[in-house]
UniProtKB/Swiss-Prot annotation:
Gene3D superfamilies per record: HUPs (3.40.50.620)
Xref: PANTHER family: 7-CYANO-7-DEAZAGUANINE SYNTHASE
Domain of life: Archaea
Cofactor note text: Binds 1 zinc ion per subunit.
UniProt GO molecular function: ATP binding; ligase activity, forming carbon-nitrogen bonds; zinc ion binding
Protein's name in the database: 7-cyano-7-deazaguanine synthase
A Pfam family recorded for this sequence: QueC
Species this chain originates from: Methanothrix thermoacetophila (strain DSM 6194 / JCM 14653 / NBRC 101360 / PT)
Pathway the protein acts in: Purine metabolism; 7-cyano-7-deazaguanine biosynthesis
Family: Belongs to the QueC family.
Primary role: Catalyzes the ATP-dependent conversion of 7-carboxy-7-deazaguanine (CDG) to 7-cyano-7-deazaguanine (preQ(0)).
Names of the cofactor(s): Zn(2+)
Top-rank EC class of the record's enzyme: ligase
Residues binding Zn(2+): 190, 198, 201, 204
């Protein structure tokens, strides 16, 4: 089936996407990028366990400083909206938005894919987060794939971004992950760097609601 690069944060969505690629018979090459996110340590711990669990062929952990201190998400000690400050179904862009993050990270994944001769780049973009994050939307994927047609060497077959969850809400992703035996219990969703999920940041609230609405027991330990 060939090779697939999977851009994976160690979170729920990207782990399910990577598991889909692996279950389809592809050799999976995970790439994680540290860009200054407060939860960097916990993400790396999660992605290392996930790589082993799904049988990834390799895990590349990369680092860039471009995004440091330009978002609440990437400023150490910055206040991240929590609890009732979070509106899960809002269409407004939250302070955790990181400017052009997915454009940059996908470019890195595309370079890795071209080097490997991988024809697919799997991502965990989904309908729930697309409401407030424009670089999670189907039209973004479509336009980025059009860019890749022009961006690779003439002798290369352009890799294509594959977003298998792009029309799904979190509850659907949880159900699918359970069905394909993705290691959901190993994933890290929290924006913070604690020993357990805080339970109150936007990402924790999406995660918790997804398990509740899916009717599947949540393996996550939350602080609140």
């Amino acid at each position: 089936m060939g090779r697939a690069v999977c851009l994976c944060s160690g979170g729920l969505d990207s782990t399910v996407a990577a598991t889909i690629a692996r279950r389809s018979g592809m050799d999976v090459y995970l790439i994680h990028v540290s860009y200054g996110q407060q939860a960097e340590r916990r993400e790396i711990e999660a992605i290392e366990r996930i790589a082993d669990a799904i049988g990834a062929s390799d895990l590349m952990c990369s680092r860039i400083d471009l995004f440091r201190n330009i978002s609440a998400l990437t400023t150490q000690g910055a206040r991240i909206p929590r609890g009732e400050e979070v509106s899960l179904d809002s269409e407004s862009t939250p302070p955790t938005w990181v400017y052009c993050r997915n454009t940059v990270l996908l470019s890195m994944a595309a370079a890795y894919a071209e080097y490997l001769g991988a024809h697919s780049i799997y991502v965990g973009f989904n309908a729930e987060e697309a409401m407030s994050y424009p670089d999670n939307r189907p039209e973004f994927v479509e336009q980025f794939n059009a860019l890749l047609e022009k961006a690779v060497a003439s002798f290369s077959r352009p890799p294509k971004v594959v977003a298998p969850l792009v029309d799904m809400r979190k509850k659907d992703i949880v159900r699918l992950g359970a069905d394909i035996k993705a290691p959901l219990e190993l994933t890290w969703s929290c924006y913070l760097n604690g020993e357990i999920h805080c339970g109150t940041c936007e990402s924790c609230q999406h995660r918790r609601r997804g398990f509740v609405e899916a009717g599947i027991p949540d393996p996550t330990e939350y602080q609140h």
